[in-house]
A protein has these predicted regions:
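Mono-ADP-ribosyltransferase
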Residues: 1-245
């Protein structure tokens, strides 16, 4: 589950924004940082040694997006650290968080300059579960701002996001609801946004799998509309319309 904070309600909102600015500005020695990271991973006891060895030997042979989307522990560890605000993990993975952010930023710049339709607004989708507590916070913040405190994977395919993620999330846990986020992205307005996004289909470990658009960490959206989705299987399915700020 992606961590979310709400402006005006959640003190975590401003704290996470300041944290993002801080760790993106730090410049570490990459060689030293990678060594410290793999040493840290070996102490955890629940990470496959072969995966650690591969990162140690081959990290520079692949892009950060390739590592992030691959069948390794990078994805789960970095998002667990950001979700739980685990300072240990964030510090050990600071080099990777910066590399991934910079890779998304560079792709965003390239795609905006070469895509002839880049000025046209478009929609992306994300299905996930949300605790009832956070859903109530979201309803209180309608018209305000919310932040996704992790790197954010979205899809251009609405049905994929609804059928594979949002509906199952509504059915699995009675203490949560299933959410289909519908995000409107206006590239012209996004020039002032501090959070880049990019189409990563060609960069992903699994190419062309789900028409994925990846946003950097701590992306801020405005909550425009919250409405119930009529569904034959559950009454705990909601659509939330967002606009990237």
């Amino acid at each position: 589950m992606i961590s979310i904070s709400f402006n005006g309600i959640d003190p975590l909102f401003m704290y996470t924004q300041l944290l993002k600015e801080t760790f993106l500005e730090i410049n570490d020695d990459d060689t030293k940082s990678i060594k410290e990271f793999v040493d840290y991973c070996r102490l955890q006891g629940d990470i496959t040694e072969n995966h650690i060895d591969k990162i140690e030997k081959d990290y520079r042979l692949h892009t950060p997006i390739w590592w992030y989307t691959g069948p390794y522990f990078i994805y789960s560890m970095v998002n667990r650290g950001l979700r739980l605000m685990d300072v240990d993990i964030i510090l050990k993975m600071g080099f990777f968080i910066r590399h991934l952010h910079q890779h998304i930023e560079n792709l965003h710049r390239e795609q905006q300059s070469t895509d002839t339709t880049s000025g046209t607004p478009f929609q992306v989708f994300r299905g996930q579960s949300l605790s009832i507590e956070n859903f109530e916070k979201m309803k209180q913040t309608k018209g305000g701002l919310m932040s996704f405190n992790n790197f954010l994977s979205t899809s251009r395919d609405r049905n994929f996001s609804l059928e594979i993620f949002a509906r199952p999330a509504a059915l699995i846990d009675s203490s949560s609801v299933g959410i289909l986020f519908v995000m409107v992205i206006d590239p012209m307005l996004c020039e002032t946004s501090s959070t880049p996004f990019a189409d990563v289909q060609q960069e992903s470990f699994f190419e062309d799998q789900e028409q994925e658009i990846l946003f950097s960490t701590h992306t801020i959206f405005r909550i425009d509309q919250i409405e119930h989705i009529h569904d034959d299987h559950t009454n705990r399915l909601w659509q939330v319309d967002l606009t990237l700020t």
